[in-house]
Amino acid sequence: MDSLYVIRERMQDLYSRYSIVADKAIQFVLAVMTFYMINNNVGFMKTLASPVVALALAIIATFFPPIITVILATALILVHMYSVSIAALVVTALIFLIMYIFYLRFTPKMAIVVLLTPLAFALKIPVVVPISCALLMSPISMVAVGCGTVVYYMMAYMKKAASGMQGGSVKGMMGQIGKYAKQVFQNKELWIVLVAFIICTLVVYTLRKQAIAHAWTIAVIAGAVVNIVVVAIGDVAMGVHASYGSLIFGSIGAAVIGVILELFFFSVDYSRSENLQYEDDEYYYYVKAVPKIVVSTPEK
């Protein structure tokens, strides 16, 4: 186990020396994956669906804050929607407008969460985002997670329905707008997942804040289990047939990543914890002190 802590210390030391380069490298990779995923799912305008375009946009986004990546991703989706029909563009633009009203008001600094959520869905481990946010952030991160979830399901619907939305009269366009909005916001699976993510986030956040041994590990495992249970109950109640294999393995993968996050952000030695008591003129204080695990890296 000590070797893991040594590796952690070396990685943290390396990051502290090259943090600017590391942050930009991570941002670039995330941007490339985001633009590639958009083009792969809703790349209806062939000119912009090229990997070269995704690479160029990622390079541009790397020199700006993460929010610019979100804005460029939004613009790319809207252009692809325009190539399908005006109806697709109008509904998608309205959905983005609603999300940005809430997003910019509550979570303007959580752009990376909005980007990571659809990517996590594509990698079949969506619950890793709410679990990670609950460990490292506050429950308000659920707003950003919700925005990313809506974007994923919106793209998933358009990937299937785009061929039926092209062309048509003004009357037909109005019908397409209503159908598109209905299919997105009345998607039972979307609402089941959103509820599961909200409950999972609250459970993980509440448990990891408790003064109990191995709070983070318990929180991660509980969050993964809660996600499986809530989605399963929702599927049965709403008549949605989800892939339980993907759900279980995705939750296990998310739990593993959660434990890795604990190693880097909350490594403590519970065997050396102490309960302290002291007082001042007004209060008695009962404090539980748990020392951090710190190891010295061997010199080469």
Predicted regions and their residues:
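Short, highly charged, low-complexity non-transmembrane loops/tails of multi-pass membrane proteins
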Residues: 268-300
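Structural signature of hydrophobic alpha-helical transmembrane segments
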Residues: 42-52, 80-94, 186-195
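Generic multipass alpha-helical transmembrane bundles of integral membrane proteins
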Residues: 120-121, 129-240
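Alpha-helical membrane-embedded segments
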Residues: 143-151, 225-231, 247-267
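Membrane-interface helix-loop-helix junctions at boundaries between adjacent transmembrane segments
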Residues: 59, 72-145
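Hydrophobic transmembrane alpha-helices
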Residues: 20-74, 80-81
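Short, Lys/Arg-rich, polar N-terminal cytosolic tail immediately upstream
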Residues: 1-18
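Juxtamembrane/interface segments at transmembrane-helix termini
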Residues: 162, 209-210, 240-244, 260-277
